[in-house]
Amino acid sequence: MRLYLDSCVLIYALDGALHLQQRTLQQLEHYAQADWVISDLVRMECLVGPLRTADQIRLLAFRSFFSDCSVVPLHPEVMERAAELRAATRLQTADAIHLAAAVHWGCDALLTNDRAFQLAQAPIGVLRLEPDQPMSPQT
């Protein structure tokens, strides 16, 4: 299974409050055998906080996590698909890019905590991360 990880998942896992970190890491462990996929946009969004505060330990934690993922580029075809998704749904720009990247790079599902994907009628599975509840596929 190829599983695209939304930025919020990594931020919860590595930079969230302790209870969010623990619950998110438990849920990620459930998908330990999956091929975790992130895009350059995920990398950028995750690094902003640690760069802003010059927190080298957090930077190292994120970069270490990235090394366990397949990092996919955002080709023009991905951006074109993101524009189509943005035009057809209520997704914000970054969310449309995440979904387009996941679809373009053959992911089976996208793991997120963002409710907006529920309304987008995504062409792939959407797994909602809920730190206080077990994950479940969205239909």
Please report, for each region that a protein language model flagged, where it lies by residue:
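Short active-site oxyanion
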Residues: 1, 32-36, 68-70, 104-109
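Non-catalytic, surface-exposed connector residues within folded enzymatic/regulatory domains
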Residues: 22, 40, 56-59, 76, ...
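Alpha-helix N-cap/helix-start capping motif
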Residues: 8, 18, 40-41, 76, ...
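Short, well-structured N-terminal submotif of metal-dependent ribonuclease cores
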Residues: 1-38, 50-61, 127-139
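A generic structural signal for short hydrophobic patches within well-formed alpha-helices
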Residues: 10, 43, 79, 117-118, ...
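Acidic, PIN/NYN-like endoribonuclease modules and their adjacent C-terminal/linker elements
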Residues: 1-2, 99-139
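Active-site neighborhoods of divalent-metal-dependent phosphate/nucleic-acid chemistry enzymes
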Residues: 70-115, 119
